Design a protein with these regions (language model features):
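Gly/Ser-rich, low-complexity
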Residues: 1-72, 87-97, 107-178, 217, ...
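Residue-level signal for the membrane-embedded core of alpha-helical transmembrane segments
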Residues: 65, 69-79, 103-107, 111, ...
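Membrane-embedded alpha-helices of multi-pass transport/permease systems
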Residues: 75, 120-123, 127, 185-188, ...
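Membrane-water interface regions at transmembrane-helix termini and the short interhelical loops
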Residues: 81-94, 183-187, 214-216
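Alpha-helix boundary/interfacial micro-motifs
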Residues: 105-106, 210, 232, 250-252
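Extended serine/threonine-enriched, polar tracts that run as long, contiguous segments within proteins
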Residues: 183-190, 194-197, 201-240
Length: 289
């Protein structure tokens, strides 16, 4: 009779351990997949992320915003010409060189507006190069060996009794569900960043039209800072993901499985918070506001 009870006990333990291993395998697999997914998403340029959206934004910019930018250029250049003429002792000390300077500024302003998308896409091409380099380092150094991680836990799981194993099943199931929710939030952050990039690019001709004027040029300068901040945000996101993967990799070796499971949940929450803050951090680095 006692041997039958022991066999039933072992059978139940094997079922629970199998469920725990399944949950842990899913969670660790999600970590590896998340690193690769985020690297792939933040490494895409606006053209590569969605060609149809990019084409729509480009058409809107060229057909709707560029004419407005032309009006802005006209106003800025007229203001610039009046300022240049009147500042020289009420037009008594006019030099022909200043007209050459004015024509040069006009040429630069028109060139910037007509090549706005080339300039903005160059910024994100550079950002893609940086993110791709970071993804190669981070992805290679932080990939978790799921099989090895699970093998290291088997002895500890076999020593546990049914109540503790049942508790672990509940904990791993709960944390696995939380990680799925966090994955949705991370997707929202990544998609939100790309939508912000498209919105930013759609109005780019207007700030570019102001860059040749000393007073109005602050608009264009701040726009460029924000543009670089959006591109550099991808690199900061990769750093956050790399730190997350390293923390999870070290957590696998923890002796207390209960603590390790909730540490994983805490690290995932911290990752989401860090991704939310990455945009503000990038803007503060470039002093964009």
């Amino acid at each position: 009779m006692e041997s039958i009870l022991e066999a039933i006990n072992e059978w139940i333990k094997e079922i629970l351990i199998g469920a725990i291993n399944g949950n842990l395998s899913t969670m660790f697999g999600d970590v590896n997949e998340k690193v690769g997914t985020i690297a792939a998403e933040v490494g895409k340029t606006p053209q590569g992320w969605n060609a149809n959206i990019f084409s729509m934004i480009q058409n809107l910019s060229e057909n709707v915003i560029v004419p407005i930018a032309g009006l802005v250029i006209t106003y800025v250049l007229c203001y610039e010409l009046i300022s240049m003429v009147t500042e020289k002792n009420n037009m008594h000390d006019i030099e022909t060189f200043m007209f050459f300077k004015w024509f040069f500024k006009a040429f630069v302003a028109v060139f910037l507006v007509t090549h706005t998308f080339d300039i903005t896409m160059a910024v994100f091409d550079m950002a893609q190069h940086i993110v791709s380099g970071a993804a190669g380092v981070i992805g290679g150094d932080t990939n978790i060996d799921v099989t090895e991680a699970l093998a290291a836990m088997q002895e500890g799981l076999k020593d546990m009794e049914i109540p503790e194993l049942l508790l672990l099943v509940m904990e791993t199931s709960l944390v696995s569900l939380c990680m799925k929710i966090m994955s949705v939030l991370i997707t929202v952050i990544l998609y939100g960043r790309m939508i912000e990039i498209y919105a930013y690019c759609s109005v780019s001709p207007i700030p570019f039209a102001t860059m040749t004027n000393w007073e109005w040029g602050q608009i264009g300068n701040n726009y460029l800072k924000g543009l670089f901040a959006l591109g550099f945000q991808g690199f900061l996101i990769m750093i956050c993901v790399g730190i997350y993967a390293v923390l999870v990799g070290e957590m696998v070796l923890a002796d207390n499985l209960h603590s390790a499971i909730f540490s994983l949940a805490a690290y995932t929450v911290i990752l989401c918070f860090s991704l939310f803050k990455s945009g503000a951090l990038a803007k503060s680095i470039f002093n964009a506001h």
